[in-house]
């Protein structure tokens, strides 16, 4: 399964989230692994201009369905509950 989405979250916050997960391994600065799921973070150009420019990242998760859904759910709840 592949899940690929754009989020209005800074790449630093996304990295910090994955680094805090005890069952996630960091392969490189923007690549993580959870069980069979590979997670790639890509920083995108901000959307908007000036002080209204929102930081954006692309989050790509690829692996077995259960693993992708499990780590995605944890990520989604973290950033949804904090407003991004």
Describe each region flagged by the PLM:
Residues 13, 38-41, 64-71:
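Short, surface-exposed beta-strand/loop "edge" segments at domain boundaries and coil↔beta transitions
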Residues 21-39:
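Surface-exposed, low-hydrophobicity interaction/linker segments
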């Amino acid at each position: 399964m592949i899940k690929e989405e754009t989020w209005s979250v800074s790449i630093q916050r996304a990295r910090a989230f994955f680094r805090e997960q005890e069952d996630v391994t960091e392969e490189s600065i923007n690549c993580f692994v959870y069980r069979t799921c590979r997670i790639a973070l890509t920083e995108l150009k901000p959307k908007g201009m000036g002080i209204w420019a929102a930081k954006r990242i692309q989050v790509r998760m690829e692996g077995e369905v259960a693993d992708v859904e499990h780590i995605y759910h944890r990520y989604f709840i973290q950033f949804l509950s904090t407003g991004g």
